[in-house]
A protein has these predicted regions:
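N-terminal cationic and glycine-rich segments that engage phosphates or anionic surfaces
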Residues: 1-90, 94-110, 116, 124, ...
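Residues that recognize and position ribonucleotide moieties
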Residues: 120
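Key DNA-contact positions within bacterial/archaeal DNA-binding proteins
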Residues: 137
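Short, basic interhelical loop/turn and adjoining N-cap
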Residues: 133-134
Length: 149
């Protein structure tokens, strides 16, 4: 479903003659990333897996933003932010830090996690429940903070 939506949107962008526009290039890059993952796995991806690929693309762009900002490359910062906005249209609504903290607290309570040694009991179920809706690093930071790490 999501892969077809990406293809349809790319066709629409092509027909609208958006050849030089960033949206078309972002859609092409996203579809290439999805296709590469399908080649690696030798099968078609599920929607959840496509979301994972797109989230990875967003994360990679977010990771380079601080470098571009430190380098004074306002043009590249704006380009990356625009690409992130385009990609986020295809991702589920992201959980707020408060929602993440509530989920982590609930899992700590449910699992009886006591400290950092029990972080696995918390991270696995929370990440499964928030798949595609929360950045793993933010969930991990929250879990560490709440577990006293």
């Amino acid at each position: 479903m999501l892969r077809e939506r990406l293809n349809d949107d790319m066709r629409t962008a092509l027909k609208a003659r958006e050849a030089g526009k960033s949206r078309l290039s972002v859609l092409r890059l996203a579809l290439a990333a999805v296709k590469n993952r399908e080649i690696d796995l030798r099968r078609e991806l599920t929607d959840d897996e496509v979301v994972d690929v797109l989230a990875r693309e967003v994360r990679s762009r977010q990771d380079v933003l601080p470098d571009y900002e430190r380098g004074g490359r306002a043009d590249l910062v704006e380009k990356m932010r625009e690409e992130i906005r385009w990609l986020q249209e295809y991702l589920p609504r992201q959980a707020t830090p408060e929602e993440i903290e509530a989920a982590v607290r609930a899992q700590i309570e449910a699992s009886g996690a006591q400290g950092m040694r029990d972080i696995g009991k918390v991270m696995g179920p929370v990440m499964q429940a928030m798949r595609g809706k929360a950045d793993g690093r933010l969930v991990q930071e929250t879990a560490k903070r709440l577990l006293g790490g």
